[in-house]
UniProtKB/Swiss-Prot annotation:
Protein name in the entry: 4-hydroxy-tetrahydrodipicolinate reductase
Residue positions of the active site: 132 (proton donor/acceptor), 136 (proton donor)
Protein residues bound to (S)-2,3,4,5-tetrahydrodipicolinate: 133, 142-143
Lineage: Bacteria, Bacillati, Actinomycetota, Actinomycetes, Mycobacteriales
EC number: 1.17.1.8
Pathway entry: Amino-acid biosynthesis; L-lysine biosynthesis via DAP pathway; (S)-tetrahydrodipicolinate from L-aspartate: step 4/4
Gene3D superfamilies on file: Dihydrodipicolinate Reductase, domain 2 (3.30.360.10), NAD(P)-binding Rossmann-like Domain (3.40.50.720)
GO molecular function, one term: NADP binding
Organism for this UniProt entry: Mycobacterium bovis (strain ATCC BAA-935 / AF2122/97)
């Protein structure tokens, strides 16, 4: 399988270049960064592209890839409901093309989101804290936002988080994602970390995941690359490939 990497000079992208080059069953067909023409992908007969670029350019990348029938595995963040709808509209004309967009490719992070969804309905309170390096473009992270949405979905019909706060400084209680407070930390020395806190009378459950190195994303990305053709259309999250429902 011929695989191209977009964002090849970034920290995650460079990790993916090395991973693809080291895989016996994959061929690195192109490695592109800012300013490189996307036509290099078609020139290299690329079948699947790994995109770890920037929210400002990822939609243009996807439009090109879909138009050319190239499958896409996307770790770039910043996707909204409107962006997902746009991707789906492009895919209508290319029913055999696959796009997988995931907020996190670390297997442990995907499992932690799944565990949080399972635990959510058993506790009165839930909050999310995400911690990342200071170069991250958005806050909260895509993983934290998705985690909060999964928790809110699992708690549908239950009372809201108890919170007697009547006055606070702006942002002190975090961002509100579907009723779940999400707090973002940006600190030198961090890579990617998340804590999900659940509380009820007499006990607290903490689900924590730490990516200590960007190689933690490699197994999930390569799994998606190898299996993406099995899922035409848009897939959001790595969960379907791990049989997590």
């Amino acid at each position: 399988m011929r695989v191209g990497v977009l964002g090849a000079k970034g920290k995650v992208g460079a990790t993916m270049v090395r991973a693809v080059a080291a895989a016996d069953d994959l061929t690195l067909s192109a490695e592109l960064d800012a300013g490189d023409p996307l036509s290099l992908l078609t020139d290299g007969n690329t079948e699947v592209v790994i995109d770890f670029t920037h929210p400002d350019v990822v939609m243009g990348n996807l439009e090109f890839l879909i138009d050319n029938g190239i499958h896409a595995v996307v770790g770039t963040t910043g996707f909204t409901a409107e962006r997902f709808q746009q991707v789906e509209s492009w895919l209508v004309a290319k029913p055999n093309t696959s796009v997988l967009i995931a907020p996190n490719f670390a297997i442990g992070a995907v499992l932690s989101m799944h565990f949080a969804k399972q635990a959510a309905r058993f506790f009165d309170s839930a909050e999310v804290i995400e911690l990342h390096h200071p170069h991250k473009a958005e806050a909260p992270s895509g993983t934290a936002a998705r985690t909060a949405k999964l928790i809110a979905e699992a708690r549908k019909g239950l009372p809201p988080n108890p919170d007697a706060t009547s006055t606070s400084l702006p942002g002190a209680r975090g961002a509100d994602v579907d009723g779940i407070p999400v707090h973002a930390v940006r600190l030198a020395g961090l890579v990617a970390h998340q804590e999900v806190l659940f509380g009820t009378e007499g006990e607290i459950l903490t689900i924590r995941h730490d990516s200590l190195d960007r190689t933690s994303f490699v197994p999930g990305v390569l799994l998606a690359v190898r299996r993406i053709a099995e899922r035409p259309g848009l897939t959001v999250g790595l969960e379907p490939l791990l049989d997590l429902h």
